[in-house]
Structure formats: structure tokens, C-alpha cells
Amino acid sequence: MPQSQIITHDAKQFAATIRPQFIAYQIPIGLGSIKSSLELIDAFSNVQNGINQYLEYDVEAFKKRYRQLREEYYAILDDGNLTSHLNELISLKKDIGYLLLDVNQASVVNGGSRAYTPYSPQVRKLKEGFFFAALTPTLRHLGKLEAELKG
């Protein structure tokens, strides 16, 4: 590889430098997926004579948590200094990832048997949730980073 194409010889330091921006750019993926899964839940809420009212998922709590996380994200962006908010960004992406997995699961169950077909929007969203959980830094990496920064 030509020397002119080498960004750095210290990959660990480079990763630490770009990490806040890298995480911040990924968060809207999770927020958008949560929003569209919540919309799917709403769209299917009254199917089959309202049977979904008996599901024990707290959809209103999901919506409230989504709004809180979204507000936290935009407050960080408004501050303009992502580097000073690394801990918050790590926690935020992790919280969004776990909420996304929960909401997507609820969306599939809420959608009934048609939600289990390979090309249903619920299954697509479920795959998006798994992708977000596995997107570097993964939920595992975020937990490790949190532990390292705390201690």
C-alpha cells in the first residue's frame, strides 16, 4: 500500500479520535427504525377485532422512551462538541439498540401471522434491528467501552 494512502500508524488512537462522530452518525439509523416499527404497531393495532389490546407490550412506554432518546440525541448535536459527549453517545446508541430490538419484537408479534412471512415489513424491521445491534461498534463493544471509560 502506498504511504500516501495510510491514514495513521496508530489505529487505536485514530479510532478513539473518530469514535464520537462515528457513533453519532449511526444513531439516526436506530431512531428511524424504531419510529417505523412503532408506526407498524399502530397500523396493526386494531386488526382482528382489536385482539392486540391483550398483548402485554407497553407500546406507550416504547413511544415515550423513543421520544426521550431522540431528544437526548438532538441535545447533544445542538451542543456541537461530540467529543465531550462520548460517554453519552455510547450510552445512547446502546439504549437505542436495545429499545429497537424490543420494539421490533413487539411489532412482529403485534402483526400476527402475516408479520412472519419472509418479506413482511415487520420481518424487514427485525433484520434492521439485528443489523443495528451488530453494527460496529456493536452492542457488546458499547458495553465494553462503557466499562472501560468508567473504570
Where are these regions (language model features)?
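Glycine-rich phosphate/cofactor-binding loops in nucleotide/flavin-utilizing enzymes
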Residues: 113-151
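Extended hydrophobic/Leu-rich segments
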Residues: 11, 51, 82, 148-149
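Residue-level signal for pocket-adjacent positions within structured domains
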Residues: 9, 13, 111, 121
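Short, charged, amphipathic alpha-helical segments
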Residues: 53-60, 86-91, 120
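C-terminal helix-coil-helix/basic helical segment that borders enzyme active sites and/or dimer interfaces
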Residues: 46, 66-98, 105-117
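Generic structural signal for well-ordered, non-transmembrane alpha-helical segments
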Residues: 32, 60-67, 90, 94-101, ...
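Glycine-rich beta->alpha junctions and the first turn(s) of the following alpha-helix
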Residues: 1-67
